[in-house]
Swiss-Prot record:
GO process terms (BP): malate metabolic process; tricarboxylic acid cycle
E.C. no: 1.1.1.37
This protein's name: Malate dehydrogenase
Key words of the record: NAD, Oxidoreductase, Tricarboxylic acid cycle
Catalyzed chemical reaction(s): (S)-malate + NAD(+) = oxaloacetate + NADH + H(+)
Recorded name of the encoding gene: mdh
Domain of life: Bacteria
GO molecular function terms listed in the Swiss-Prot or TrEMBL record: L-malate dehydrogenase (NAD+) activity
Residues that hold NAD(+) according to the record: 11-17, 107, 114, 131-133
Gene3D superfamilies referenced in this protein's UniProt entry, alphabetically: Lactate dehydrogenase/glycoside hydrolase, family 4, C-terminal (3.90.110.10), NAD(P)-binding Rossmann-like Domain (3.40.50.720)
Paired cysteines (S-S): none
Length: 328
């Protein structure tokens, strides 16, 4: 058996948390030879804590061989103590009549506190994935609130958008998703993100040779991927939970265990690539090895793509400007 890993999960009794925890305990995130301790955080109210206790009871009843221990708490300092990985799933959802800027403010308070707690008690090499929306800006806030930790280790989840785009291409081409490579989702995890298959291949053949149809790209593919979350809410009455948890597993597994040369999409702090301001958490194509990621460099950006990338960048800059005064 490999060394034990401590995983903190916030919003642990929520829908995504419930879909996520059992799969982590089964070894799907860190490997089937890595015991885990789940450190679960929920809100400090009676109902949330009772629900979290119920989740813990169910985890116990699964008798997972890899589950070496559990912590349930409403205190971030306890949840993040010595964490090797932190999945920040819990966030304030948008309520009726709530403006986007109000949502940003409410979440800024949450992620400032969580970033500070990580800075105080987590392992110095902790790897952080923000799932709670608005994920990119929440990740930026947490990163800025943890000055003693490696900023490169704060990431946002765009893997759900990536997987949604993969599925749409698979359906269009009649090819298995496993045979499609080099897909990218640029930008913000929001309806402005830009799924880009200009470099993608299916069975090694460029997809743009099979789908040479800019109208389908602009009028069907991009809108379907960008509005998929809303379509699921409309159909199900609830937001994506199992698919979001699955994407979180994919993101962390590939980051920690390596993508084997394949391109994946991660929201990571920009190093200035593609004209994206340094430090902004932005969806890029990356490859991963030995627990570190590298942005795929020097891809040509055509006029069509630049329009979309500029739009998602403008949204992120606006979000960042609205919360900068709250950061230290």
């Amino acid at each position: 058996m490999k060394a034990l890993v401590r995983v903190a999960v916030t919003g642990a009794a929520g829908q995504i948390g419930y879909s996520l925890l059992f799969r982590i305990a089964a070894g799907e995130m860190f490997g089937k030879d890595r015991p885990v301790i789940l450190q679960m955080l929920e809100l400090p109210d009676e109902k949330a804590q009772a629900a979290l206790k119920g989740v813990m009871m169910e985890l116990e009843d699964c008798a997972f061989p890899l589950l070496a221990g559990m912590v349930v708490t409403d205190n971030p300092d306890i949840a993040f103590k010595d964490a090797d990985a932190a999945l920040l799933v819990g966030s304030r959802p948008r309520g009726p009549g709530m403006e986007r800027k109000d949502l940003l403010m409410e979440n800024a308070k949450i992620f400032t506190a969580q970033g500070a707690a990580l800075n105080k008690v987590a392992r110095r090499d902790v790897k952080v994935l923000v799932v709670g929306n608005p994920a990119n800006t929440n990740a930026y806030i947490a990163m800025k609130s943890a000055p003693d930790l490696n900023p490169k280790h704060f990431t946002a989840m765009l893997r759900l958008d990536h997987n949604r785009a993969l599925s749409q291409l698979s359906t269009k081409l009649g090819k298995p998703v496993a045979n499609i490579e080099k897909l990218i989702v640029w930008g913000n995890h929001s309806p402005t993100m830009y799924p880009d298959y200009r470099f993608a291949t299916a069975d090694g053949t460029p997809i743009i040779e099979a789908i040479n149809d800019q109208a389908w790209n602009a009028n069907s593919f991009i809108p379907t991927v960008s509005k998929r979350g809303a379509a699921i809410i409309e159909a199900r009455g609830l937001s994506s939970a199992a698919s979001a948890a699955n994407a979180a597993i994919d993101h962390m597994r590939d980051w920690l265990l390596g993508s084997n040369g394949k391109w994946i999409t991660m929201g990571v702090p920009s190093d200035g690539s593609y004209g994206i301001p340094e430090g902004m958490i932005f969806g890029f194509p990356v490859t991963t090895t030995n627990g570190e990621y590298s942005i795929v460099k020097d891809l040509p950006i055509d006029t069509f793509s630049k329009t979309y990338i500029d739009k998602t960048l403008a949204e992120l800059e606006e979000e960042r400007a609205s919360i900068t005064h709250l950061l230290r």
